[in-house]
Swiss-Prot record:
It catalyses: 2 superoxide + 2 H(+) = H2O2 + O2. This is Extracellular superoxide dismutase [Cu-Zn] 2. Residues 381-404 are annotated as: Disordered. It is an enzyme of class 1 (oxidoreductase). Its cofactor is Cu cation; Zn(2+). Its EC number is 1.15.1.1. Keywords: Antioxidant, Cell membrane, Copper, Glutathionylation, Glycoprotein, Membrane, Metal-binding, Oxidoreductase, Signal, Transmembrane, Transmembrane helix, Zinc.
Length: 427
């Protein structure tokens, strides 16, 4: 009997290992600041029943040999200053600046080492942060590389970089939900059928502290290399407003969607996956209550010069925290709300946490009429403005319907004059 129980426990343990969910995130670097260090590469983030593992694959042709601190930052992006990312991420406000340890801040990592314009592969294993729904989730936040190094670096005396404090960001990336199809085999997680990627942002993010934004950049599917702009997601207690301003797109209708993954592994837009959805949701237009969470319809309203396209929607259909860390796409053609979602993805980006936005950020004209189905094609916003009332051409009361004194005097004198003439003729 005891052997049977032990055997069952072994089997159940094996099943739990095989079917264990995992988390996968992806973070693609780009240079920031006044000096372009031409830093490229990415970080993969994986966890499965344990610590969060970060694996770096980064290169640079402009960084001198030395050591450079890395840290997880509070914001994924800051529209007013792309090097001010809100400071190193802290869960409880405790900790001091140092390499990851018991006394460090949650977001403090380690130093990267640069030699011959190559940043060496590095591996961090963390327990202070996660990429699953919890107060210490870093989905939607950023990883920054600093000009300075941590003082805990034993090699600091042999390199040219200065030792803290960490003030000068030279590169950063937005931590997005990764596409499971791209998990490197060397990352040590079991992605077999039945295991789900449960990465996500903290579901109780403060709507008084954060908004979210995606910066758009063209993909290799775009005929234009000049697509840009951004989409702002402004959070409130019971809704999310979506304000988009997009430049460089063709003068046509474009599908406009939130996608499942904030994963920029591929430059053609494929790695952001399908639309963000849950369960049995189907592709449809707003405000269909069974549609994908990511179905925002179309982008079709332009300014008079057709230089910028504008989008606006306020909805309570999806949560603010649910969209953080996901991908976003502008499509080449119109989404028909049925089987055709718009073809190639001509622009993409990752939804990042940002500080609570000023009311003027991504402010679309408030007197335009916005629609997202766009069945009649493109139009200009100015054409939707209600015309001002034109001055009335109806005669004033003193002119016609309510004649004044002068209106009565003229016929009266005519009558008197006619009577006098008649009397004279009789005489």
């Amino acid at each position: 009997m005891n052997k049977l129980i032990i055997s069952l426990l072994i089997v159940l343990s094996a099943i739990s290992i095989i079917s264990a969910d995992y988390q996968y995130g992806y973070c693609k670097f780009g240079s920031v600041g006044t000096v372009n260090q031409n830093i490229t590469g990415y970080v993969t983030l994986t966890a499965q029943d344990g610590a969060l593992n970060l694996v770096y694959n980064i290169s640079s042709i402009n960084l001198p040999t030395g050591s450079y601190a890395t840290a997880i930052m509070t914001y994924g992006y800051n529209p007013s200053n792309n090097t001010d990312l809100g400071g190193v991420f802290q869960v409880d406000g405790k900790g001091t600046e140092q390499c990851q340890s018991g006394g460090s801040r949650a977001g403090d990592l380690y130093n990267l080492y640069v030699n011959d314009n190559r940043i060496s592969s590095n591996f961090d294993s963390l327990t202070s942060v996660s990429i699953v729904d919890s107060p210490n989730s870093i989905i939607g936040r950023s990883i920054a590389i600093f000009q300075e190094s941590y003082s805990c670096d034993l090699l600091k005396s042999s390199v040219g970089t200065s030792v803290g404090p960490l003030t000068t960001v030279v590169a950063s990336c937005i931590i997005g939900i990764g596409n499971s199809a791209n998990v490197p085999a060397t990352n040590g997680v079991n992605t077999t059928t039945g295991n789900a990627n449960t990465a996500g942002a903290y579901s109780s993010l403060s709507n008084t502290q954060y908004d979210a934004m995606v910066l758009l950049a063209n993909t290799t599917k775009s005929p234009s290399a000049a697509i840009g702009g951004s989409v702002l997601f402004r959070s409130s207690s019971n809704s999310v407003s979506v304000n988009g301003i997009v430049s460089g797109v063709a003068k046509s209708v474009h599908g406009f969607h939130i996608h499942a993954f904030g994963d920029l592994t591929t430059v053609d837009g494929a790695s952001i996956g399908g639309h963000w959805l849950s369960g049995a949701q189907v592709h449809a237009f707003p405000e269909n209550t069974s549609r994908h969470f990511g179905d925002l319809g179309n982008l079709c309203i332009f300014d008079n010069d057709f230089k910028n396209a504008y989008y606006y929607l306020s909805t309570s259909y999806f949560s603010f925290s649910g969209l953080v860390g996901r991908g976003f796409a502008v499509h080449a053609a119109r989404d028909d709300g049925n089987t055709y979602v718009g073809g190639d993805r001509v622009a993409q980006g990752v939804v990042a946490l940002i500080p609570k936005a000023a009311t003027t950020l991504n402010q679309v004209p408030s007197n335009w009429k916005y629609e997202v189905i766009c069945s009649n094609g493109t139009y200009t916003g100015e054409s939707t403005i209600e015309p001002s009332p034109t001055p009335s051409t109806t005669p004033t009361p003193t002119e016609t319907s309510q004649p004044g004194t002068s209106s009565y005097l003229a016929p009266f004198f005519v009558l008197i004059l006619s009577s006098l003439i008649s009397v004279i003729l009789i005489l």
